[in-house]
Amino acid sequence: MKKITAALLCVMLVICTSVTAFGATKSDVKQKTDTAVAFAFDGNYSKNGYDVSSSKNLYILARSGADISAYTDAYFKSVAQAASESKLTDPGTIGMAVCIAKAAGIDPENANGVNLADALKNADVSVVSSPYNYFYAIEAAKALGLNDTVKALSDTLAKYYTVGTGTDFWNGYGTSPDDLAMFILAMKTAGAYDEYTEDAYKLLETYYTENGYSNYGANADSTALALAAYSIAGNTEKADAVYDILIKNFYDEKTGGFKADYDEYYATADAVFALSFYMPIAQEDGQESTTAPETTTQAQTTTAADNKNSDTSKKSPSTGVEIAPAIGAAAVALMAFAAAAKKKKA
């Protein structure tokens, strides 16, 4: 009887401490990416083509792996016009143009006559318009081997960060999960300010809820950008867990896009962006699911907690998977075996 009880207790402990994070295979991620592109881009953004003012959407489309050749002529004519009018000044916009050129097989040093590499190298790093654009600029500078530009951009970006409170790009309005995620992407790409990046991950977790990452409510955009932030670090277990939440709570099987209260096309574009980071670390087809660790970083108490949802059901913070049923099942099995053993002994 003691041996049976001990064995069952071991099983119960294994069940209670090993919650599976399913994540997705590369085929799963590609399928979600393809339907999202069809919804947000084929069905909306791509209908009128792209110019320099819509660089972000063409950049995301290029990141998805879609064929962008139908749009590049008009786009780079627009870039050339902006350059000729001295309007191509934001390093982020230049960075996106560089990445688009590379994706299309166009030389960034001669994109419709514009030397984008020189434009990025000579741009004023203080005129970057958003945390997103710091990432785009750093990504492009890194790809072009412009190490001094990468350093100048990351040094300027770091001035917006305070350890313990995060970023503030908005003159006192503070940080958000979206800004923290983009800060992480930029600094991870630059390979700079590791102390700030680690702090940003801790702060990002204060926005975690079981329904997704919350910015005045759980939403697809914040959850997707958190997925990108964990993916770029190669944190497969955490990325798998966030991916599961993103798909479960925000993917729309009917449209193939991602749900949002205000703009489903915008939310879907952010999801496509995030999936491009997750794809390299997603499971190979046929690979078995991994097992999430027993615990994850606990959310710290900050003012961000005011924005969280109040769902109090007990789930693993690593996966969002309910653990009570597993505990209950193990307990029932234990009692059943104990009763059977007692009856047999009698």
Predicted regions and their residues:
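Positively charged n-region of N-terminal signal peptides that target proteins for export
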Residues: 1-11, 341-346
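Sec-dependent signal peptide cleavage junction
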Residues: 15-31, 312-323, 342
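Terminal, non-catalytic domain-edge segments
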Residues: 23-35, 245, 260, 266-297
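Alpha-helical repeat scaffolds
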Residues: 34-40, 70-84, 110-125, 149-161, ...
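An alpha-helical repeat/solenoid feature that recognizes helix-turn-helix modules
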Residues: 43-68, 86-107, 126-150, 163-197, ...
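Predominantly the C-terminal beta-signal and adjacent terminal strand-loop region
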Residues: 243-261
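C-terminal low-complexity, Ser/Thr- and acidic/Pro-rich disordered "stalk" regions positioned immediately N-terminal
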Residues: 282-319
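A cross-kingdom C-terminal cell-surface attachment/processing module
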Residues: 321-343
